[in-house]
From Swiss-Prot:
<feature type="binding site">
    <location>
        <position position="59"/>
    </location>
    <ligand>
        <name>Zn(2+) 3</name>
    </ligand>
</feature>
<keyword id="KW-0805">Transcription regulation</keyword>
<keyword id="KW-0862">Zinc</keyword>
<feature type="binding site">
    <location>
        <position position="71"/>
    </location>
    <ligand>
        <name>Zn(2+) 3</name>
    </ligand>
</feature>
<feature type="binding site">
    <location>
        <position position="30"/>
    </location>
    <ligand>
        <name>Zn(2+) 2</name>
    </ligand>
</feature>
<dbReference type="GO" id="GO:0008543">
    <property type="term" value="P:fibroblast growth factor receptor signaling pathway"/>
</dbReference>
<dbReference type="GO" id="GO:0008270">
    <property type="term" value="F:zinc ion binding"/>
</dbReference>
<feature type="binding site">
    <location>
        <position position="2"/>
    </location>
    <ligand>
        <name>Zn(2+) 1</name>
    </ligand>
</feature>
<comment type="function">
    <text>Transcriptional activator that mediates FGF signaling during neural development. Plays a role in the regulation of cell movement. Does not bind DNA by itself.</text>
</comment>
<comment type="similarity">
    <text>Belongs to the Churchill family.</text>
</comment>
<dbReference type="InterPro" id="IPR009508">
    <property type="entry name" value="Transcrpt_activator_Churchill"/>
</dbReference>
<dbReference type="GO" id="GO:0045893">
    <property type="term" value="P:positive regulation of DNA-templated transcription"/>
</dbReference>
<feature type="binding site">
    <location>
        <position position="64"/>
    </location>
    <ligand>
        <name>Zn(2+) 2</name>
    </ligand>
</feature>
<feature type="binding site">
    <location>
        <position position="33"/>
    </location>
    <ligand>
        <name>Zn(2+) 2</name>
    </ligand>
</feature>
<feature type="binding site">
    <location>
        <position position="5"/>
    </location>
    <ligand>
        <name>Zn(2+) 1</name>
    </ligand>
</feature>
<feature type="binding site">
    <location>
        <position position="66"/>
    </location>
    <ligand>
        <name>Zn(2+) 1</name>
    </ligand>
</feature>
<feature type="binding site">
    <location>
        <position position="88"/>
    </location>
    <ligand>
        <name>Zn(2+) 3</name>
    </ligand>
</feature>
Length: 112
């Protein structure tokens, strides 16, 4: 992974978890060839361990094939919530939790 290719390493993305794609606003240019071109997604794998889906891939420079960052995305269901996480030097770090119920109990206002 290369900190010289990005503006900020592991930026906080709040609840934005990317299963695929690249956060190009954080991409400066390839430190190896000094070009700012498309970022390829290579070596993509999907695995499931103990009910957790894990997707990993590499962000790679289109021109010189320099590996910019390694991306990891996870998805799991815990109790009544879908849990998402993302960790990537280019795309950032993020977590999200979404209720599988029609009305999220955490969003309901107290009656009293």
């Amino acid at each position: 992974m290369c900190g010289g290719c990005v503006q900020q390493e592991y930026p906080d993305r709040g609840s934005t978890c990317l299963e695929t794609g690249s956060y190009l606003l954080n991409y400066v240019s390839c430190v190896q060839c000094n070009k700012r071109d498309f970022v390829l997604i290579v070596n993509k794998t999907a695995a499931e361990e103990d009910g957790e889906e894990i997707i990993t891939y590499d962000h790679m420079c289109k021109n010189c094939h320099h590996v910019i960052a390694k991306h990891e995305y996870t998805f799991s269901v815990v109790d009544d919530y879908q849990e998402y996480t993302m960790l990537c030097m280019l795309c950032g770090r993020a977590e999200d939790s979404v209720s599988v119920l029609p009305d999220d109990p955490r969003q309901m206002a107290p009656l009293f």
